[in-house]
């Protein structure tokens, strides 16, 4: 099974965040946001068949956006913005996630430079990596094409 790492979008602040076991299927995502993306956590099934709970990366509280994917549902598109917020030069300010069941989830406030990752045909997001401190500085995705 091929795995592709795409990104990062955002700034260079914070610490690098990544997973150690390659992902096979994304189960769910929880995002906390306000004027920016404050934290992200997710669950996935690894290529070893085990379930992993990752994060939260970032910190702080805010509005919770919970995405629980059905057994045959997957994320087919992620877009968002990144730019200056508070006294930080470049962080992820907004995320929009669309699933194969045409469910759309939004978190944060659109502000800054736009990015979009529409996936072709059967491609789907199976995990995340990025940079975080007290907020999400940058985000990238793992994709099964």
Swiss-Prot record:
Induction: In response to salt and related osmotic stresses. One of its GO terms (molecular function) is carbohydrate binding. It comes from the Eukaryota. Residues 6-64 are annotated as: 2 X approximate repeats, Gly-rich. Disulfide bonds: none annotated. InterPro entries: Jacalin-like_lectin_dom (IPR001229), Jacalin-like_lectin_dom_plant (IPR033734), Jacalin-like_lectin_dom_sf (IPR036404). Pfam families: Jacalin. The keyword Lipoprotein does not apply. This is Salt stress-induced protein. It comes from Oryza sativa subsp. indica. SUPFAM superfamilies: Mannose-binding lectins. Signal peptide: none annotated. PROSITE patterns: JACALIN_LECTIN. The lineage of its organism: Eukaryota, Viridiplantae, Streptophyta, Embryophyta, Tracheophyta. Sequence repeats lie at residues 6-15, 54-64. Keywords: Lectin, Repeat. CDD domains: Jacalin. Sheaths and roots from mature plants and seedlings. Residues 3-145 form the Jacalin-type lectin domain.
